[in-house]
């Protein structure tokens, strides 16, 4: 299970996936490792053009968002009864995908501030 940062290489496509987490997200994924596994699978599907994933643009506000992140889209992924709010930066020319996971929790608690 990742601490604050995780890196993975897809041997088939040679794309490098970088995942960055808040401390809150690390705790959640330690309790719900299957959600992290499914999240990674869905990110790869999304990058490969699969539209059969429940991902939408996040409509809420993110507190304390740094300048770098303001330029990125904030997305929400549904995984069963859980939601993951994240940002993604795709560098296809360098074969790199950066994923910044902001929050992960149950559907009931994800949107509470």
Functional labels for PLM-detected ranges:
Residues 1-2, 38, 57, 66-69, ...:
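Short amphipathic alpha-helical surface micro-motifs
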Residues 45-76:
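A short, surface-exposed loop/turn module that caps and links secondary-structure elements
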Residues 15, 19, 61-72, 90-97:
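Intrinsically disordered, low-complexity coil segments
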Residues 1-46:
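Arg/Lys-rich, positively charged N-terminal/basic patches that mediate binding to nucleic acids
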Residues 1-5, 43, 58-65, 89:
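Intrinsically disordered, low-complexity boundary segments flanking structured domains
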Residues 43-49, 110-113:
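Short, surface-exposed, polar/charged, turn-prone segments marking secondary-structure boundaries
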Residues 1-8, 26, 74-113:
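Enriched for short, Lys/Arg-rich terminal
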């Amino acid at each position: 299970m990742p601490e604050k940062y995780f890196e993975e290489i897809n041997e088939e496509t040679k794309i490098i996936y970088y995942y960055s987490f808040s401390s809150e997200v690390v705790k959640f994924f330690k309790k719900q490792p299957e959600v992290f596994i499914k999240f990674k699978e869905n990110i790869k599907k999304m990058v490969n053009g699969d539209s059969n994933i429940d991902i939408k643009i996040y409509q809420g506000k993110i507190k304390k968002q740094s300048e770098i992140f303001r330029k990125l889209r904030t997305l929400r992924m549904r995984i069963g009864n859980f939601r993951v709010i994240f940002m993604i930066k795709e560098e296809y020319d360098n074969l790199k995908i950066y994923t910044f996971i902001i929050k992960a929790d149950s559907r009931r608690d994800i949107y509470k501030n």
